[in-house]
Design a protein with these regions (language model features):
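Non-catalytic, usually N-terminal nucleic-acid engagement modules in DNA/RNA processing proteins
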Residues: 1-24, 136-139
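Glycine-rich phosphate/ribose-binding loops and adjacent secondary-structure elements
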Residues: 21-30, 34-145
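Residues immediately within or flanking Cys/His clusters that coordinate Zn2+
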Residues: 148
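Cys/His-rich metal-chelating microdomains
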Residues: 157
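Conserved small/polar residues in nucleotide/adenosyl-binding loops
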Residues: 161-164
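Short cysteine clusters
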Residues: 151-154
Length: 164
């Protein structure tokens, strides 16, 4: 806990410094709420950062090896501490199920390398799970990437043979 507390204090100092350095720039800035898996440290972090004029708040320090249930519980606790009128951003979480779980817990934005890495290996996320597009069965397939999906990409632009 002592290490998490020190990291939180450093983050708070950097938050203040970053706002001063931004000056009058119109660029959006997000603060990163820290505190590891300790709800009282998350609260301390959120209480301090939400008093500052940040445009949004990132929930940091998750998706780094903790159990999925711990990540989800901590995400829910942290998101509930943040203002609903500004974006709440979860860093480093990117599987479809993880995104849905995070939205359910109050998160608005995400970034993660997982979709990119999955795509690099010729795989796509679909409503039925992962689809291995480099399999020979899809070489001449006119079937849509995800027939159950109504998004513009799945509806108009992607048959399985063209995606890879």
């Amino acid at each position: 806990e002592a290490t998490a507390r020190r990291a939180l204090e450093i983050t708070q100092r950097w938050a203040v410094r970053s706002l001063k350095a931004r000056g009058d720039s119109p660029q959006s800035m997000f603060a990163i709420v820290q505190g590891a898996l300790y709800p009282h440290l998350r609260k301390q972090s959120a209480d301090g950062l939400t008093q500052l004029p940040f445009d949004g708040f990132a929930i940091g320090g998750l998706a780094v090896g903790e159990e999925k249930s711990q990540r989800e519980d901590t995400c829910e606790v942290a998101a509930a501490m943040l203002p609903a009128d500004r974006p709440r951003y979860l860093m480093g979480v990117g599987t479809p199920l993880d995104l849905l779980e995070a939205v359910h817990r109050g998160v608005d934005m995400f970034d993660c390398i997982i979709p990119n890495k999955v795509a690099q290996f010729g795989t796509a996320f679909t409503s039925r799970g992962l689809l291995q597009l480099r399999r020979s069965v899809y070489k001449f397939s006119d079937e849509k990437l995800d027939p159950a999906c109504g998004c513009p990409v799945c509806r108009k632009y992607s048959d399985r043979k063209s995606v890879v």
